[in-house]
Structures are given as C-alpha cells and as structure tokens.
Amino acid sequence: MLLATDLDGTFLGGDPKDRLSLYQTIAAHPEIRLAYVTGRSLESVLPLLADPTLPQPDFIISDVGASLVHGDSLQPIQPLQSAVDALWPGDSQVASAIERFALERQDVPQVRRCSYFCNPEQAANPELLTIAESLGCDLLYSAERYLDFLPKGVNKGSSLQALIDWLELDNDQVLTAGDTLNDLSMLSGQFKGVCVGASEPGLLQATRQYSLVFHAERAGCGGILEAFVHFGFLGKQGIAAEGKQVAEPGKADLMMVYHRLPYEEFRGADGKLQRRRPTSPNGIIPTLLSFFGDGRAGSWVAWAEHDENSGETFDSHTTVDAERYPKLTAARVALSKEEVDIFYKRFSKEAFWPTLHTFWERGQFREDDWQVFLKVNRAFAERTALEAAEGATVWLHDYNLWMVPGYLRELRPDLRIAFFHHTYFPSADVFNVLPWRRQIIGSLLQCDYIGFHIPRQVENFVDAARGVMPLQTVSRQNCAPRFITYGCAVGLERMTTAVDTGNRVVKLGAHPVGLDIERVRSALAAPKIREMMERLRSELAGVKLILSVERLDYTKGILEKLNAYERLLEENPELLGKVTLVTVCVPAAKEMTIYDELQGQIEQAVGRINGRFARIGWTPLQFFFRSLPFEEVSAWYAMADVMWITPLRDGLNLVAKEFVAAQGLLDGRGVLVLSEFAGAAAELKGALLTNPHDPVDMTQTCYVALNMPKAEAQARLRELFDIVNYNDIRRWGDEFLAAVSDPQEQLDRALGLVG
C-alpha cells in the first residue's frame, strides 16, 4: 500500500503515543510505502529527513504538488517533474503581473509556485483570478491568509495521481490523509482517505459527500491509525493486530555507554579470557565508576570482540567489581573482529577523526563502512534499551556512538539521554563535509543534554545543527569568568545553553574534563619516581628542559614544533648546550598505517636537527618513540622548565593539565606553552598561548618561556594549578550529571534566575 500524507497537523501531529505507534508500524511493515504530500517546499522538508524518529519517505510531493522527488536520493521523479516544469511561467512573471496588489510574499522557500499572505477581502478580488488564468496558473487560497499561484492543473491530488499511475498502483491500495483545505484535492473521493481529528471545518464540510473519506476523531497520527482500522489495512484486524511495543524497561537507573569496558580483557597462559582493573592512566573510567559506589543500580554498555565460530560462550553480562560496585554490571555488545576493525579502528579514524579536527581533506568516506557504523550503533542502542530502568539516565560518550541517541529515542522514549563529546567539534563548514551530517545531527538532537569541553565547541555544534533543521534559541549565557573570551582562538563571549527543535528542548553545556589529581600525587610520591627525578635533576644540571608529550597524529603539530625548535636554535646560538627538547611520542597501533608517512617525516626531522646542532656531551633533541608509564612521564613533568604543547587542533588536551598538576604539587615554576587551538586554551589562564600555524610565533613564544622571570613563572603556575586542582575530574562528572538530572535548574542558571 501507499500512505500519502500531509505533514503539518497530520503526520507530524497528534498525541506522542499515537505518533510513536504509527511510526513503528510503518517501520515494521516494509510493504507500506510512504509519500509526504505537503505544501512545504522541498527545502523545508529536508530537516524532517534528519529526524531519526520519523519514517523516511519513499517519495516527496512538495510545493503543493509542484515538486516530486524520490525520498532517498531527492532526485526528481521523471518524467513527472518535467511535465510540471513545462506548465510554470516563472516567478518573475507572476511577481510582475500582481505587483500593483502589494501582496506580501511569504518568507519561505518556494519552487514552481509563488506564495503570498492575503486577507479574505484581497482574495475575493476577481482580477487575481483573471491574472492567474492569463499566466496559465491556478489560484489556491487556504486558512484565510495563504494565496498560492501554482502551475495550471497542478495540486496535491493531481501530482499524487500522477505518482500512483507511474507506480502502476490501484487507487484502492492508497490511503491519503490531511487536515486542511490545502489537502482537498487528494481527499476528493478518488482514494481512500482520512480527515484526521481537528481538521479544518471547511475540509470536513467539503468531504462529507465522499464515501471513501473517513472522518477520524483523534488528531494527527491517531486519526491515521483509526483509518488503518476503518479500511482494514494490515489485515482484518487492522492496526489492532500490531504487537510492536516499546522495549520493556530494565533495572539500571544510570547507564554508561562507552567504547571501552570498565576493565581490561586479556588472554591468560591457558588461553582463556580473563579480566583485570584498567592499567591505563585514563582517569575518566574510575570517575565514571565512582557514580556507582553508593550502591546505585547501573549498567555499563561497551563492545567486546567475539568470534562466533570460536566455540566460546559469550557472556553478555559480567560483574565489574562485586565489592566496590555491587549493583553495577557490564553489558557487553558482541562485535566480530571485522566490525571492530571497521567501526573503531578504520572508519572512526579515517572518516570522522580527520574531519572533526579540520583535516577534512584526509577523510575517507565509505558508504559500506557507514552501514557497519550504523549496525554497531544500533546494537549499542538495543542493548541500552534492554538494560535501562523506566526514566533512567543514559550517559553516552563521544563520536563513536553518534547514532545511538536516534535509535534509543525510538526504542525507549522515556529515557533521559545525555551525550558528552570528548573530541573537538568543528565549525559548520567543516562538519558539513561529512556525507551523513544530517543523520548525525538528527540523532544528537534526540538527546536531552549534550556537553562539550568549551563554549566554542557548543556554538560550533549549534551552527551545524541550524544548517540541518530550524532551531529556536531558548537561552544563552556569558562564558566568563569560567572561560577566556577574546584572549585565544577558541574563546567566545556568549554561548547557547538550550535550543528548541520543535519536538524537544535540548540543553547544552561546556564541561572541560578535569584531572585525577590524586593519581598524579600518587605517582610523584612513589620512591622509584623520586629517585628518577633526582637522577634527571643531576643529568640536566645547567640545561633547561623543554618537554613535549603527545600521540603520533597529524593533529598534534609534531612536525611544526620540531621545525620551530630548529629555528629557535638557528636564531639563538647562545642556547646551544643550554637547552634540550625531550619529546615523548606515543606510537599508533600497528593497524593505523595512515600515520606511517608522518612517522618517517618526524624521524628525518629529528636526525636533521641532531645532526646540525649536537655537540660532544650535549644532544639538542631526545626523541622517545614509545609509550612511557604514567609514573615516568610524571617525573618528566616535574623536571620540565617549559611544557611545549602545540596541537593544530584539539578538543581539550589533558597533558597540559597533567603538567600543571605535577608542577603545582611540587611548588614548581615550569611554564606552559599551549596552542591556542587546544580546547584547554579557553580554560587555562596563565598559559603562554601560541599559534602552531605561525612558525615565527612558535619560536618566539618558546624563547619567551625559556627566559621568563621566576616570579612571573611562579605566578602563572599558581593560577594554572588553582584552576586544575579545583576543576578536577570528580567535579567534572558531578557537574555534568547535575546538569543532566536537573535541567530546569540548569536553565534557570543560564537565565540568571538563580545564583
């Protein structure tokens, strides 16, 4: 069958439960083809295609019948569209002909039609009809204020009939639905039709004579559901035979949905899978776990690799730590090795990572990979829907799970969905390079709350979202004093804190991830680390240490930094023998071959610099191309005179905070030189900011740091440590969850209603 429905007041209207029921019914029955038949322009329909809760149409008839396109490709349905095109005289001819009437043009997109605001008195002027006929146009007047000039003989009904003939469907296989006189042409008795509840009186009056037109009681989608029953679609019992329901709730009050399990899995000597506490210095996992320390019932959803042909039993649920978190379980999503490679290692890093960090020209966008990404995100959503209690809070993490909110909202509309974007979010012109931007934004806007590190990233997201669908700003707030406004490239004066999508209000916030200060304190207190610091202090006597710690990645600006260091030594020969740069570069996984060329370029630069400037007893550059234990890195932090962090783009940069913590805990006076394109630059007042895209500025800023007076260095570090120590990772988690769980208070704060 074909369901041909008007949108506003019909397919988009009615009780939320009726809407969900109808949408799920359509999704469950692929034999139901869907056509949007609307007075909106095609451009105004596009935002709906980004809404994952709406069934996507097979066909779209827009502009009151003047535009006909395929729902998937948005390409014209030919030859139907060409037939309409031939009937249209052109916008300028219509505008010129009615210029003396001083009608106000509607400020909405219009194609092959001209739409005006017109009062009943103006509409009654017979000259308008005469002009329309002379142009070869029809006039359509609706709702006592809208006047449309349309191609002769073209309306919703005529275009729908042309589509049905083109599809070679019997009219008996069609159900039409509408609510205003604008829909009369497709509710004139040639098809089974429904005037949904609360329809325009004029439409009800005009259709009473038609036996095939049913007048429903319930509004919007509820009326369409009534029509399914009335006409016996989907069998004799109609919609009553449908058994699809919203997923039954689980028991978890708080859901963590993360790409990593809260423990590490490894193979023991016997080849069996074993588990242990995380050994990574990542402080986020312990913090997220801490929310379950009070006995709160929760579930942690993450993927685990599993070979279906291995013969091993897959444990979908495991305990995390029975003593510390007695009511927390890990809900594991089984992924094959191929799915892991595509979803996590290849697609996310080759398509999304470069685009998010503004290196879109490096992106590789494969539709097959996108389909795997959707499949995995759907699996995450289904697992979450099964675990979550009624009204539970779901906390999703990062771009790997972009599409989960959309799927989850459909499965469990009762849930409170929160998303934290750990990675940088670029400006709209960069993000829009992604072929799937509409689907991604549409999914994220199903959240109740979305958090980013800094205000600039919040605003970038809002700009990208505005390019997908119309948004109304609900509230904004000043970024100061928490964040720098005009003092860095990623600063901002005001940010949006809530937007209205038309279906929901989405709250937004800036929450820079904090540091686990106790982990740094513990590392520095270890006897072997104290011995290491003493050894380094002796080895570096008379030499200033510049430290650089980063992963091997083109976003980190490693080559740019090495070139700036070479310039520093060239222009300041008095530094030879007096300064050394130690770079710790963590290699990428073996499968990440996209970094091979960069690694070669870095190795050449290191060799060139040491070859040019090295002396007996002094090496200008020490390069560690390996991962060092966090405790050892902490010792280097404590000994550094200058910490040189110069990513070309970064969501935040926790290394900067680790350096500040190590120095602050030991009353040091190291200087932080930080890229102004790192998210942390908007938060860490006291850092020396540098532009990694400007070689001269890079060199000069490093030189200033090396020669900074002790008093200034100490003052800057005190300011930095105060920020890092106060806004630690525990505060980050508490504030984020508070914003999610009490959105009204968050909104009141944004509006300045509370202190």
Curated annotation (Swiss-Prot):
Record field: catalytic activity: ADP-alpha-D-glucose + sn-glycerol 3-phosphate = 2-O-(alpha-D-glucopyranosyl)-sn-glycerol 3-phosphate + ADP + H(+)
The protein's annotated pathway: Glycan metabolism; glucosylglycerol biosynthesis
Signal peptide range: none
UniProt xrefs under SUPFAM superfamilies: HAD-like, UDP-Glycosyltransferase/glycogen phosphorylase
Keywords: Glycosyltransferase, Transferase
Top EC class, one word: transferase
Gene3D superfamilies, A to Z: 3.90.1070.10, Glycogen Phosphorylase B, HAD superfamily/HAD-like
The EC number(s) this enzyme carries: 2.4.1.213
InterPro entries per UniProt: Gluc_glyc_Psyn, Glyco_trans_20, HAD-like_sf, HAD-SF_hydro_IIB, HAD_sf, SPP-like_dom
Gene Ontology BP, a term: trehalose biosynthetic process
One family name in Pfam for this protein: Glyco_transf_20
One annotated GO molecular function: alpha,alpha-trehalose-phosphate synthase (UDP-forming) activity
PANTHER family documented for this protein: BCDNA.GH08860, TREHALOSE-6-PHOSPHATE SYNTHASE
Function of the molecule: Involved in salt tolerance by producing GG-phosphate from ADP-glucose and glycerol-3-phosphate (G3P), an intermediate in the synthesis of the osmolyte glucosylglycerol (GG).
Similarity annotation: Belongs to the glycosyltransferase 20 family.
Protein name: Glucosylglycerol-phosphate synthase
Phylogenetic classification of the source organism: Bacteria, Pseudomonadati, Pseudomonadota, Gammaproteobacteria, Pseudomonadales
Gene assigned in the entry: ggpS
